[in-house]
Amino acid sequence: MARLSEPSPYVEFDRTQWRALRMSTPLKLTEDELVRLRGLGEKIDLLEVEEVYLPLARLIHLQVAARQALFATTAQFLGEPQQNPDRPVPFIIGVAGSVAVGKSTTARVLQALLARWEHHPRVDLVTTDGFLYSNSELSRRNLMHRKGFPESYDRRGLMRFVTAIKSGADAACAPVYSHLLYDIVAGEKQIIEHPDILILEGLNVLQTGPALMVSDLFDFSVYVDARIEDIENWYISRFLSMRAGAFADPASHFHHYSTLTDEQAVFAARDIWHSINRPNLIENILPTRPRATLVLRKDSDHSINRLRLRKL
């Protein structure tokens, strides 16, 4: 564990230091399960789950228990009835980071691990993609070229959804996004019913503003970090893999990319990266990193070897 030379709200760890914090937390995830959770291009293995994600799951488990005790204390102070142990106040986790950095895999692995703890078996995962405006609405607002930027999301709808969850609503509905169609699926909803833990994953979930933001309702947050040059390479590699995979489906919005040569595909991917994803990362996503409870720092091979925990 390394304390920064200047006063700081963070404590830094290398992987060896961090893995020691696992204590006796058991690994209840199999190789087959991990394969299903792993995103395209991700290299996560069971060793990384043991050394990085199990200590993180243990930390979150401890914080869930502490948060519930705090809610009980507040209820006692207000003279309110103790909360139903079968319906605790949901613990909300935000997972942020760039396109292609691996935040979706991080969110899925966390969901799988946390759901195996006895005291919080209901762990739901929602991505903010569902709160993008539909393509027709983005076109009406002249925002198709800004898709993924903060203004392309229904931020009020997202705020209503998370507030409903946090307030103990019986159910809350999130729109569903199709990466195949590159659009919201009309009439389809993801129904979330009083979870113990909700994981909200997306590019801009840690953003702040003059009014109440969704990040203000988080109990814990993770930022998946890497060098910008590495993320660009991962994005291009993923694009090439999808050209022969998802893009080959005639129903895919990006089917026209499936016939590109390697050289053409790299050129197209790099153009998208530099015109959309890189500016969004630098202008909107990266500035939110200091707000995260925990920063996971990846090396060029996708492995997590540095962590920064916010202690305040």
Curated annotation (Swiss-Prot):
Its domain of life reads: Bacteria
**Record's catalysed reaction(s):** (R)-pantothenate + ATP = (R)-4'-phosphopantothenate + ADP + H(+)
GO annotations under biological process? coenzyme A biosynthetic process
Q: Does the keyword Cytoplasm apply?
A: yes
SUPFAM superfamilies cross-referenced by the UniProt entry:
P-loop containing nucleoside triphosphate hydrolases
EC numbers for this chain? 2.7.1.33
Short name of one Pfam family for this protein? Answer: PRK
Give the main localization category.
Answer: cytoplasm
Give the record's pathway: Cofactor biosynthesis; coenzyme A biosynthesis; CoA from (R)-pantothenate: step 1/5
Enumerate the Gene3D superfamilies for this protein: P-loop containing nucleotide triphosphate hydrolases
Sorted alphabetically, the Gene Ontology cellular component annotations on this record are: cytoplasm
MF annotations from Gene Ontology: ATP binding; pantothenate kinase activity
What keywords were assigned to this record? Answer: ATP-binding, Coenzyme A biosynthesis, Cytoplasm, Kinase, Nucleotide-binding, Transferase
Top enzyme class, one word, equals transferase
Location relative to the cell: Cytoplasm
Q: Please report which protein family the annotation says this sequence is part of.
A: Belongs to the prokaryotic pantothenate kinase family.
Q: What protein name does the entry list?
A: Pantothenate kinase
Q: Which gene encodes it?
A: coaA
